[in-house]
């Protein structure tokens, strides 16, 4: 049985991809078979943090050049990875049929992973929402900035009203302290609960860190380059809580027939 977890955000620049990559690697290092799908279509860059340059991507699959299993790359840490590619015009303008083809194709994988982490494009674009609704669990990354609050709220509102999603995990990124992060979550939850009947689960925070910035510059993930650091421990702690997020029952097609 595969648990699919979408990592998303209301706006870009909040560290969503960094979190998705490090959580996927954290699970892999715990000996959990994990697949990372970069579904930030046309703007895919998770491979940069992994320090790899995949030969193939979803673009090859969509064009009919390769089967999905042929575009899966295995990293040196044994993480399975599917690149979203950088053919912006092709990937940003996918039809509903093409998006559904991508989703249903994952069921053809012979050896199903225990977890699939999906790096979703920021915001409430159609392609992002389709992949979100097809995941079992959704995690929203936000920061303490007012614009991040507004955009995250808008994303959750759209997910709830248009796609019947009502369960969301929340990660506060770029925080100055655990206390400040929790206060930011409490404030966001209070605002959200005034208008939407949704469940928000606080999973933890990732601190503002020069080490994380350096790891991005050096094309590496801090979970592997600084495995004993407080930052790596923060990712490990969050990865241990992923299953605490309730599953959404959207009625949408799913990546795997569990």
Residue spans for each PLM region:
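G-domain G4 guanine-recognition motif of GTPases
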Residues: 10, 143, 168-182, 205-212
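Gly/Ala-rich phosphate-binding loop of Rossmann-like dinucleotide-binding domains
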Residues: 28, 132, 160
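NTP-binding/hydrolysis catalytic cores, primarily Walker-type P-loop NTPases
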Residues: 217-258
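Inter-motif core of Ras-like GTPase G domains
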Residues: 108-111, 125-146
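Walker A/P-loop phosphate-binding motif and the immediately C-terminal alpha-helix
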Residues: 3-40
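Anionic-ligand binding region
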Residues: 146-168, 178, 183-184, 188-191
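Beta-strand-loop-alpha "switch" segments that mediate conformational coupling across diverse proteins
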Residues: 195-223, 235
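P-loop/Walker-type NTP enzyme "switch/lid" segment
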Residues: 37-111, 216-218
